């Protein structure tokens, strides 16, 4: 599996990328980064969360509103509605990534970001778009990572390390500046400091798992080779 992932990474790293590919890569980073989410101008359309939108609310008693999932659900039926709620963001993100790939953006990501992500996390640069997406949306990044794994562009080891990065503080920007607003007035430091701490420990957590995997691979060389 490792040899297959390295072979694919090598092909992407040596394949020539035109200006169109680099432009697609940078535009996709901007799209998933959330930099335009707070503006009221027309360029809000270049933000993932804006295009993803939101479901309407159903009117209830006494002026209250609920989502289409309703309230008090349980079991498989409520789980089905929850999964249905996640579908639009996953479909949209995978569609954007397919367009980016068709324009050569993933090859550009591999060539530009591998020298950065390999030392930091031990994963190839092709993961960079999912890494950026994870800052704003949990499901989009997970879907993109699954697609990379299924296409053999990342190894099982890469997937495990990357999942550790994503699980810790997932959708940090969206959650921090929505739910976190309630405690901003009580912070004894700058608003950006807790955000930076969370981001740093996303990398710390992934590297702790990375060290553990290295230890296990040295202890069981045959098992590490199969991964």
From Swiss-Prot:
Where does it primarily localize? membrane
Q: Please give, as recorded in its UniProt entry, the membrane topology of this protein.
A: Multi-pass membrane protein
Q: Which domain of life is it from?
A: Bacteria
Asked whether the keyword Lyase is assigned, the reply is: no
Entry keywords, A to Z: Cell membrane, Membrane, Transmembrane, Transmembrane helix
* Record-level GO cellular component terms: plasma membrane
Q: Where in the cell is it found?
A: Cell membrane
Cross-referenced InterPro entries? Gate_dom
Positions of transmembrane segments: 17-37, 79-99, 112-132, 181-201
The answer to whether keyword Transmembrane helix applies is yes
Coiled coil (residue ranges): none
The name on file for this protein is Uncharacterized protein YjiH
Q: Which organism is it from?
A: Escherichia coli (strain K12)
Q: What is the lineage of its organism?
A: Bacteria, Pseudomonadati, Pseudomonadota, Gammaproteobacteria, Enterobacterales
């Amino acid at each position: 599996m490792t040899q297959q992932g390295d072979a694919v990474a090598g092909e992407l790293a040596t394949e020539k990328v035109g200006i169109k590919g680099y432009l697609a890569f940078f535009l996709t980073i901007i799209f998933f980064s959330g930099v335009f989410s707070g503006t009221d101008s027309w360029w809000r359309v270049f933000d993932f969360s804006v295009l993803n939108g939101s479901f309407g609310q159903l009117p209830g008693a006494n002026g209250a509103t609920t989502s289409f999932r309703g309230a008090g659900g349980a079991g498989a039926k409520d789980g089905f509605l929850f999964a249905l709620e996640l579908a639009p963001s996953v479909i949209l993100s995978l569609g954007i990534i397919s367009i980016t790939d068709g324009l050569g953006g993933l090859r550009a990501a591999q060539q530009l970001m591998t020298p950065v992500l390999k030392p930091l996390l031990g994963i190839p640069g092709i993961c960079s778009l999912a890494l950026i997406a994870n800052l704003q949306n949990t499901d989009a990044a997970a879907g993109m990572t699954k697609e990379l794994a299924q296409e053999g562009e990342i190894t099982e080891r890469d997937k495990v390390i990357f999942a550790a990065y994503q699980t810790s503080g997932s959708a940090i920007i969206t959650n921090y500046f929505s739910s976190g607003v309630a405690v901003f007035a009580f912070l004894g430091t700058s608003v950006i400091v807790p955000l930076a701490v969370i981001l740093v420990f996303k990398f710390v957590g992934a590297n702790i798992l990375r060290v553990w995997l290295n230890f296990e691979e040295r202890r069981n060389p045959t098992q590490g080779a199969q991964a």
